[in-house]
Curated annotation (Swiss-Prot):
The gene is rpsD. GO terms for biological process: ribosomal small subunit biogenesis; translation. GO terms for cellular component: small ribosomal subunit. Keywords: Ribonucleoprotein, Ribosomal protein, RNA-binding, rRNA-binding. This is Small ribosomal subunit protein uS4. Residues 94-154 form the S4 RNA-binding domain. Belongs to the universal ribosomal protein uS4 family. PANTHER family: 30S 40S RIBOSOMAL PROTEIN, SMALL RIBOSOMAL SUBUNIT PROTEIN US4M.
């Protein structure tokens, strides 16, 4: 288990929110940050603090992306004509690990990245082992046949805690997921409020 995987719930505690909607999240029992002083009353955040928190929450949701990774995606979103916040969400949702997670082939975004990295997935019939691989509309993602009986796959497909969004079409008989279209913010089933507009404001000032 990687350090990032074992630390996944630290993100929930740091944010004080159950950002993936998981039943086992520690914030279901308490709503304060990690550490023995977590129960102290929170001070009101400044504009900078609010923007920073929005950025940390969004990049944390996609598997605690590094600042370098997230900043690169944001820079790409800025170059595309349209609302930068919407473009940012669309680019994040086009990541292969995000689609594997959305399709419920694995239970967590962290498991999705590891699953892809270990070569369990193909895109249009070709094995791809890069979680950040960017899928296009119409791409067909499939779990390789020898990987379909893995315990985490069998567990994930039975999860009732989240639904597959309508921009992904899943056929569990073939273990395929077709990326139908690039979603906007309103299409993505985030369990908590995400504010990419605040991320845009953060990078505009920093």
């Amino acid at each position: 288990m990687t350090k990032r995987t074992s630390a996944k719930y630290k993100i929930d505690r740091r944010m004080g929110e159950n950002i993936w909607g998981r039943p086992k999240s520690p914030v279901n029992k308490r709503e304060y940050g990690p550490g023995q002083h977590g129960q102290r009353r929170k001070n009101k955040l400044s504009d900078f603090g609010t923007q920073l928190r929005a950025k940390q929450k969004l990049k944390g949701y996609y598997g605690d992306l590094t600042e370098k990774q997230f900043r690169k995606i944001f820079a790409e979103a800025e170059r595309v004509k349209g609302d930068t916040g919407e473009m940012l969400v669309g680019l994040l949702e086009r990541r292969l690990d995000a689609i594997v997670y959305r399709a419920k082939f694995v239970p967590t975004i962290f498991a999705a990245r590891q699953f892809v990295n270990h070569g369990h997935v193909t895109v249009n019939g070709q094995r791809v082992n890069i979680g950040s691989y960017r899928c296009k509309e119409g791409d067909v993602i499939q779990v390789r046949e020898k990987s379909r009986q893995l315990a985490l796959v069998l567990e994930a497909t039975q999860l009732a805690e989240r639904d597959v969004p309508d921009y992904i079409e899943v056929d569990y008989s073939k273990m395929t997921a077709t990326f139908v279209r690039t979603p906007g913010l309103g299409d993505v089933p985030y369990p908590v409020q995400m504010e990419p507009n605040l991320v845009v404001e953060f990078y505009a000032k920093n």
